[in-house]
Amino acid sequence: NSPKEIADKTFLYLHTSYPEKGGWDIEEGILSNNLSGKVLCTYVCRGCSHWSPSKYRGPIKRCQKCGQRSAFMPNVGHGLSIEELIKVYNLFDLYVQYAICEGFGMPQVEAACCGVPVAAVNYSAMEDVVKHTNGYPIKVQKMFRELNTNAERAYPSNEHLAEIIETHFSKDEKFREQKSKDVRQGT
């Protein structure tokens, strides 16, 4: 697979939405960067509780099951069951935790328990999680001090993540299946 072929098959999957005052505006970021065709989301219906993955259709979309315009991205107040969450993780070929810092991140461990290889920034608690899940550590590009918290944070290397993705998906299916087994057994 060439880098272009890999990029054409690569999607960002957003499972949850955490709206916060002064925080990220997910819709604005997706639309302003012309990414709506490359972003997949989990939507769950307020009416019938049916969930499904879908290309990004805005904060609310029509439910595939009941037809009502009431499906939204799950959040801490209205999420999925453990069994449904396992099905979401099993949609992934690679879980990427691309954060400037992170406490102990359950999503990384959950993904690894489902046999999904993890790539995470080699900093903070992510460093230990990626090490113990036989994952891919993403190099830190540079450190900075966050003004609001006065804490040190890490900018991940975009180039190194691209190399990880290219390397992982350039391997044959047999290698990726074995990697999945190794990740699951090591978690």
Question: Which positions does each model-derived feature cover?
Answer:
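Aromatic "clamp/platform" in nucleotide-sugar-dependent glycosyltransferases that forms part
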Residues: 100
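Conserved sugar-transfer catalytic core signal across GT-A, GT-B, and GT-C glycosyltransferases
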Residues: 84-85, 107, 114
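Short glycine/serine-rich donor-binding loops of glycosyltransferases
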Residues: 105-108, 126
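Conserved donor-binding/catalytic loop of nucleotide-activated donor transferases
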Residues: 90-92, 110-116, 121-122, 131-133
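A short, well-ordered alpha-helix in the C-terminal region of glycosyltransferases
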Residues: 167, 174-187
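Short hydrophobic signal-anchor/transmembrane segments that target glycosyltransferases
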Residues: 1-7
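Nucleotide-activated donor-binding/catalytic signature segment of Leloir-type glycosyltransferases, i.e.
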Residues: 23-87
